[in-house]
Amino acid sequence: MTSRPAAKSPKPKSPKLSRDVIINAALTFLDREGWDALTINALATQLGTKGPSLYNHVSSLEDLRRTVRMRVIDDILQMLSTVGTGRTRDDAVMTMASSYRSYAHHHPGRYSAFTRMPLGGDDPEYTAASHAAAAPVIDVLASYGLTGEDAFYAALEFWAALHGFVLLEMTGVMDSGMIAPGVGSEAGRVDTDAVFSGMVLRLAAGMAHRNDPGGNP
């Protein structure tokens, strides 16, 4: 008796495409492959389809990338708002800073997307969204007595410091393998968490004295 060939397993169905499905897939793609690798064809391959199918939902690569950036900004806004709720001064600043750092490390591709367009660019919607993302920080700075332009500039300084630290970590320049000068042993390895906490607390101390007549500028 001749045995029948085993039936082939059906191929898993590709997800039904929609704009949300495509954008969510792009976010996942970013963290695995990076911003520069994000193309229509590469994303279509991840979704198990062909590039032209995506054009039914996104008009171009620029449309895709812009929408991804807007989503990332909104994610960061929601994250900062959530962790900052009910907190003030140093407690809020440290919690927000730590959450920002954690987001960048867990979502490196998305973080790269967040920093790819200048705040003063030609896209008013993107600029407005970026300013909105700073709002939770500016709200916390009010607990230090900072408002208006003072609060906005303090928020920019805070963000610049966080971004610089995160970038040094993500590029491998700042890591736990660093040895403090003059120590030269395992005991002298740099505690990057302690460096980060110290930096944030010094920034917070500066905010507390920013409006003092004899305080730090």
What are these regions (language model features)?
Residues 1-17, 182, 211-217:
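N-terminal intrinsically disordered/low-complexity leader segments
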Residues 21, 25, 29-63, 67:
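Helix-turn-helix
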Residues 30, 64-72, 114, 122-133:
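Alpha-helical DNA-contacting segments of helix-turn-helix folds
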Residues 50-52, 56, 64-83, 87:
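A glycine-rich, hydrophobic loop/mini-helix early in the fold
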Residues 81-110, 121, 131, 148, ...:
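Hydrophobic alpha-helical connector segments
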Residues 105-122, 167-178:
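Amphipathic alpha-helical segments used for helix-helix packing
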Residues 120-145, 152-156, 189-205:
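Amphipathic alpha-helical packing segments from all-alpha helical-bundle domains
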Residues 160-180, 205-213:
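Amphipathic C-terminal alpha-helical segment
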